Design a protein with these regions (language model features):
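Extracytoplasmic intrinsically disordered, low-complexity "stalk/linker" and propeptide segments
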Residues: 1-5
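Exported/periplasmic cell-wall-interacting domains
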Residues: 7-22, 42, 52-61, 66-137
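Short glycine-aspartate micro-motif
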Residues: 24-26
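Residue-level detector of high-confidence beta-strand sites
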Residues: 45-47
């Protein structure tokens, strides 16, 4: 392609959308809540349990990088078979269903975001690999 005779202005940079479909997840550690958004519209909210002070949930902006309908989870001092609806967003941190407790609203996890299984199922079907996960206090 031959060069133009006159310089062309640099195109204006536009921030990319949160995801192709505008969906994103907000994890509020202070209030132990997860919010599902489509652009600026809240479409669902869930009471959750996140990490304890000894095993805190990471903060920052991440993207779901893999989803498992069911898989085992383990770490120092625990093994949990068949954990439902896992969506990992950073290393071993994820959102998932929880069958071993129902104490939602209280930090109890090893760093993951624990949801009721039926609510985790909804979020799992709604979100995609690549969906933004914003985690904050």
């Amino acid at each position: 392609v031959p060069p133009t005779e006159e310089p062309v202005e640099e195109p204006e940079w536009v921030e990319p959308p949160i995801s192709a479909d505008g969906r994103w997840i907000d994890v509020d550690l202070t209030n132990q809540m997860v919010y599902a958004y489509e652009d600026d519209t809240l479409v669902a909210s869930f009471l959750v349990s996140t990490g304890t002070w000894m095993t805190p949930t990471v903060t920052g902006q991440y993207h779901i990088y893999v989803k498992y309908r069911s898989a085992p989870m383990s770490g120092p001092g625990y093994y949990l078979p068949d954990v439902p609806y896992i969506m990992y967003f950073y290393k071993g941190y994820g959102l998932h269903g929880t069958y071993w407790h129902s104490n939602f609203g209280t930090p109890m996890s090893h760093g993951c975001v624990n949801l009721r299984t039926d609510e985790a199922a909804w979020l799992f079907e709604w979100a995609s690999v690549g969906t933004l996960v914003n985690v904050h206090y």
